[in-house]
Curated annotation (Swiss-Prot):
Superkingdom assignment: Eukaryota
PANTHER family on file: LEUCINE ZIPPER CONTAINING TRANSCRIPTION FACTOR LZF1 (PTHR13618), PROTEIN ROGDI HOMOLOG (PTHR13618:SF1)
Family of this protein: Belongs to the rogdi family.
Organism listed in the record: Rattus norvegicus (Rat)
Ranges in coiled-coil conformation: none
Cross-referenced InterPro entries: RAVE2/Rogdi
Gene Ontology CC annotation, any one: synaptic vesicle
Keywords per UniProt: Acetylation, Cell projection, Cytoplasmic vesicle, Nucleus, Synapse
Quaternary structure, from the entry: Monomer.
Protein name, per record: Protein rogdi homolog
GO BP annotations, alphabetical order: amelogenesis; bone mineralization; brain development; circadian behavior; enamel mineralization; gene expression; hemopoiesis; locomotion
UniProt gene name: Rogdi
Tissue: Detected at synapses in the stratum lucidum in the hippocampus CA3 region (at protein level).
Length: 287
C-alpha cells in the first residue's frame, strides 16, 4: 500500500513538472507559431496597413463558367473592394449583346473580405496580449484564450465560406445595381459575393408577371443563388426570374488564407487537447 502511494506521488510529481513545462514553455511556442501563421494570413488580404504606403495592388480576374458562355467579363479586385467590373451579357432570346461596367468613380466593398480580415486582426491582438513575459498559471486560462482565438478564426473562415442569403428585393435594393454605366436595364439584377476561394457574379434576368397571369404568386425567400421561376414584388410590379447566369473566378490568396485558418484552428485544438489530458488527473482541483 505504501509502495503504491509512493509510486502515485512520484507519478503525480512527474505530471506536475510536465504540466509546468507545458504552461511555461510549450504554450508560448504555440502562441508564437500561431502569430506567425496569422500574420501571413493577414498579409494575403493585400490591404494597405500601417507599414505599407499607397493603395492596395489591383488584380484582374477573368470570369468563367463551364456551363454557360452567356456572361463573360473581367473583375478588378483591389484589397477588399471591386474597383472595376467589365461584363458582357448575351441575351438568350435574341442574342443581343449587352455591355456594362462600373462607373469610374465607384468601388464596391466586399464586406466578407473586410470582416474576415478584421477577425484575423482580432485573433492576432488576443495572441499578442499574451507575450513571452506573461506567465500562465492554470490550464483553464490557456483554454479560455484558445477558445477566444478559435472563435475569431471560425468567424473569419465562415465569412468566406458562407455567403449571405439575400431575397430578390434585397438584391434589387443593393447599391451594386447602381454602380454600372450604362445603367442596368430594369429587367436585370446583379449580385457579387465570395464563396470559399471564389469571387462569384450572378446575373438575373427578369420578366414582369401580368395581372392576368394564372401563375400562383409565391414570393421567394432568401438564398445565395436563386433559381429560374423565383418570384418577388418590387414597387408595384410582380416579377419572376427567367434566366440565371453565374460566373466565377478563383482568388488564389483567398485559398491561402483558408488554409492558414485551418492550420491555426488545428494548432489551437491540439494545445487544448494537451491541456485537457492533464485535467483527468486533477479532476478534483483546478488544473
Amino acid at each position: 500500500m505504501a509502495t503504491a502511494m509512493a509510486a502515485s506521488a512520484a507519478e503525480r510529481a512527474v505530471l506536475e513538472e510536465e504540466f509546468r513545462w507545458l504552461l511555461h514553455a510549450e504554450v508560448h511556442a504555440v502562441l508564437r507559431q500561431l502569430q506567425d501563421i496569422l500574420k501571413e494570413a493577414s498579409l494575403r488580404f493585400t490591404l494597405p496597413g500601417p507599414s505599407t504606403e499607397g493603395p492596395a495592388k489591383q488584380e484582374n480576374f477573368i470570369l468563367g463558367s463551364c456551363g454557360t458562355d452567356q456572361v463573360k467579363g473581367v473583375l478588378t479586385l483591389q484589397g477588399d473592394a471591386l474597383s472595376q467590373a467589365d461584363v458582357n451579357l448575351k441575351m438568350p432570346r435574341n442574342n443581343q449583346l449587352l455591355h456594362f461596367a462600373f462607373r469610374e468613380d465607384k468601388q464596391w466593398k466586399l464586406q466578407q473580405i473586410q470582416d474576415a480580415r478584421n477577425h484575423v486582426s482580432q485573433a492576432i491582438y488576443l495572441l499578442a496580449n499574451r507575450d513571452e513575459s506573461y506567465q500562465f498559471k492554470t490550464g483553464a486560462e490557456v483554454l479560455k484564450l484558445m477558445d477566444a482565438v478559435m472563435l475569431q478564426l471560425t468567424r473569419a473562415r465562415n465569412r468566406l465560406t458562407t455567403p449571405a442569403t439575400l431575397t430578390l428585393p434585397e438584391i434589387a435594393a443593393s447599391g451594386l445595381t447602381r454602380m454600372f454605366a450604362p445603367t442596368l436595364p430594369s429587367d436585370l439584377l446583379v449580385n457579387v459575393y465570395i464563396n470559399l476561394n471564389k469571387l462569384c457574379l450572378t446575373v438575373y434576368q427578369l420578366h414582369t408577371l401580368q395581372p392576368t397571369s394564372t401563375k400562383n404568386f409565391r414570393p421567394a425567400g432568401g438564398a445565395v443563388l436563386h433559381s429560374p421561376g423565383a418570384m418577388f414584388e418590387w414597387g408595384s410590379q410582380r416579377l419572376e426570374v427567367s434566366h440565371v447566369h453565374k460566373v466565377e473566378c478563383v482568388i488564389p490568396w483567398l485559398n491561402d488564407a483558408l488554409v492558414y485558418f485551418t492550420v491555426s484552428l488545428q494548432l489551437c485544438q491540439q494545445l487544448k487537447d494537451k491541456i485537457s489530458v492533464f485535467s483527468s488527473y486533477w479532476s478534483s482541483r483546478p488544473f
